[in-house]
Each structure stands twice: as C-alpha cells, then as structure tokens.
Amino acid sequence: DMYGDITCGDMGLNTQNYGWFYTDELGQSYTRRAYLWSYYYDIIRLTNKCVNALQAQVGKEGLTEVELINAHADEFYYYAEVLAMRGWAYANLQKWFCLTPEQIATQGYTMADYMSIPVYTEEATEQDTIIGAPLSSAEDVYRRAEEDLKSAIYYFDILEKEGMTRTIKQEM
C-alpha cells in the first residue's frame, strides 16, 4: 500500500521537504499509527461481514462445490476477493505492528508463543468493539492470512477453469 511506499527509506520526493513523514514512525502512539491499525481492522470487520453473509446465502443448497460455484459465480468472485482482502489486511497488520519471524526466533520465542495482534473471523459484536479480542499468536495470524489468500486463489482458479473470468478492470 502507499503508506509503506512513503515511509520506506528510498522514497523519492521532488521537492525540498524530504523527511516530512519522519514523525509518523516515532512511536506506536502517534496518530498515523493509530490510523493504520483502524484502517486494517475496518477492512477486516467489513470482510468478515461479507464472508458471513455470502456463506449464509450460498451454503444451504446441498450442491457439490463446483455446482455451487456455477450457480453462484458472482457471489464466489466477491467471496474470493473478500478473502484476499482479509488475508492482505492481516499480513500488513503483522508486518507493521509485530516482529518478523526471524526477529521472533532471535528473541527466543516460537511463532506459537509470540503474541502479536488479535484475529477476528466473525462479525464483531458490540462487546468486542468495546473490549477487543485477546492477542493471537504470530502463528495464528500467519495461518489466518495464508488460509484466506490460498482460499481466494483456489476459488479464482475454479472460476477461471469454469470459464468465469473478469477481464474488465472495474469488475475486479
């Protein structure tokens, strides 16, 4: 995403105000850090809502997976896109707010016992929004992101094999 490009060390600027984004990286309590956290969790909240709605809509027909996909091609496109977005959001949250797997190992932790960020897979209730979910292990976060991304690829591949592709940019 663009924020990552702007805050990297080799971002080229065409004016003399180099370093204007320096204060963004001073600490996790800085406003833009809070914005990043909220931005990705808003995406996750909305994708969870979509995933649950789509599962409820197409999951009751007793069809094989391919028959179900053929019967609901548009819904499965949305489902695949939403899963990809949720996986992307978790991967970015992990990148921005947690240690890398190498850093975790260097500090003597395993991926299973290093607590990183909360994982939400259901729609958040009012209580969840007030209190928040407990932290999940880095292993759980990476697993969630990987499962979502692999599922998205899987559904896109099936849709493509069945001849259901989107070639217009606005449909992506």
Q: Where is each model-derived feature located?
A:
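Transition-metal
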Residues: T7
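Aromatic-residue-lined binding/catalytic grooves and analogous aromatic/hydrophobic interfacial grooves
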Residues: Q170-M172
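Long, repeat-rich segments with strong aromatic
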Residues: R166-I168
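Conserved, well-structured interaction surfaces
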Residues: L13-L99, G132, S136-E139, S151-G163
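Acidic, glycine-rich segments characteristic of secretory precursors and extracytoplasmic regions
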Residues: D1-Y3
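Short coil/linker segments at helix-helix boundaries
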Residues: E61-L68, W96-R144
